[in-house]
Amino acid sequence: LKKDGKLPNGLIAPFKQLPVLDVDGKIFAQTGAIARFCGKLSGLYPKNNEFEAAQIDQIIEAAQDINYLVTLSGRDKEKDRLALARKILATKHLPKWFQFLENLLAENKDSNFFVGNKISIADLAIWRLLGWLSSGLLDGVPTNILEPYEKINRLREEVYKHPKVNEWMLKTYGKKI
């Protein structure tokens, strides 16, 4: 993406930022919009069930809220203030949000997924976010931060089992799960 918002094919990114998706010369921007578009095409987002769509949307927006908290916690580059911000994130904010997610998973008695009995874009969004949060890449966020959350860990296992996820992991990271 060039500074003026042009993509390599000459089209303009609507907000002059990534991500964008080019479908036959039509450009879509914003992670949620792209996820819903692809989700509808792939069966990971409901086409005709507005209730399930709203349930999925609330999870995606929760992931955005969590991501925002992580971003805020990393803004201060002064070492001691950054460490304090990350400590608050890891001991206060993230556990609160993880419990919200745990409660939503408990409400779905049909499966280990957030909505219905099959994987959706909500599950994928949380799976990737949780992978990052527990990766050790974020100073001050322990890699075992998810240990207390049984349902979240079951969700992660279910997502890891999906053949397309394994295919993506192999292609992206050179390893299967």
Indicate where each model-derived feature is located.
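Alpha-helical packing segments of well-folded alpha/beta enzyme cores
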Residues: 93-100, 129, 152-155
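C-terminal helix/juxtamembrane-tail motif
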Residues: 158-177
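Acidic, serine/threonine/proline-rich low-complexity intrinsically disordered regions
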Residues: 80-88, 138-147
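Extended, charge-enriched "interface" segments that sit outside catalytic cores
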Residues: 104
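Short amphipathic alpha-helical interaction/hinge segments
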Residues: 67-74, 132, 137, 167
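Residue-level recognition of oxygen-bearing side chains
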Residues: 33, 151, 164
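GST superfamily/GST-like fold recognition
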Residues: 56, 114-141, 147-153, 159, ...
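GST-like domain detector, emphasizing the conserved glutathione-binding G-site
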Residues: 1-98, 107-109, 118
